[in-house]
Curated annotation (Swiss-Prot):
Induction remarks: Induced by auxin. Triggered by brassinosteroids.
UniProt protein name: Protein SMALL AUXIN UP-REGULATED RNA 12
Pfam families (UniProt xref): Auxin_inducible
Superkingdom as given in the UniProt entry: Eukaryota
GO BP: any one term: response to auxin
One GO cellular component, as annotated: plasma membrane
Function, as annotated: Provide a mechanistic link between auxin and plasma membrane H(+)-ATPases (PM H(+)-ATPases, e.g. AHA1 and AHA2), and triggers PM H(+)-ATPases activity by promoting phosphorylation of their C-terminal autoinhibitory domain as a result of PP2C-D subfamily of type 2C phosphatases inhibition, thus leading to the acidification of the apoplast and the facilitation of solutes and water uptake to drive cell expansion. Triggers plant growth probably by promoting cell elongation. Regulates branch angles and bending.
Native source species: Arabidopsis thaliana (Mouse-ear cress)
Lineage, uppermost ranks: Eukaryota, Viridiplantae, Streptophyta, Embryophyta, Tracheophyta
Subcellular location: Cell membrane
Major localization class: membrane
Record gene name: SAUR12
Free-text tissue specificity from the UniProt record: Expressed in flowers and etiolated hypocotyls.
């Protein structure tokens, strides 16, 4: 049990770090004291996908999945994590939805 809790804490810390690097997810959104959007349930985080930058809320458990990690690496290579666009995933929405349904 302690290992799972430690893993979840690590995932949460990683997510907070990524979101802070992205700095601004939306100009008119409300944030909590940690700088996280209030409309995102605990244990989840927002990502923006596709040309239209559609917003998806995904569980932090995805951070440990190899295919999602690959998407994050692509995002870092293409956009970096220090920009004002939020965490942007560089793939088509249909591909992202297919991947997330496979993972979840």
């Amino acid at each position: 049990m302690a290992v799972k809790r430690s893993s979840k804490l690590t995932q949460t810390a990683m997510l907070k770090q990524i979101l802070k690097r992205c700095s601004s997810l939306a100009k008119n959104q409300c944030y909590d004291e940690d700088g996280l959007p209030v409309d995102v349930p605990k244990g989840h985080f927002p990502v923006y996908v596709g040309e239209k930058r559609s917003r998806y809320i995904v569980p932090i458990s995805f951070l440990t999945h190899p295919k999602f990690k690959s998407l994050l690496q692509q995002a870092e290579e293409e956009f970096g994590f220090n920009h004002d666009m939020g965490l942007t995933i560089p793939c088509e929405e249909v591909v992202f939805r297919s991947l997330t349904s496979m993972i979840g």
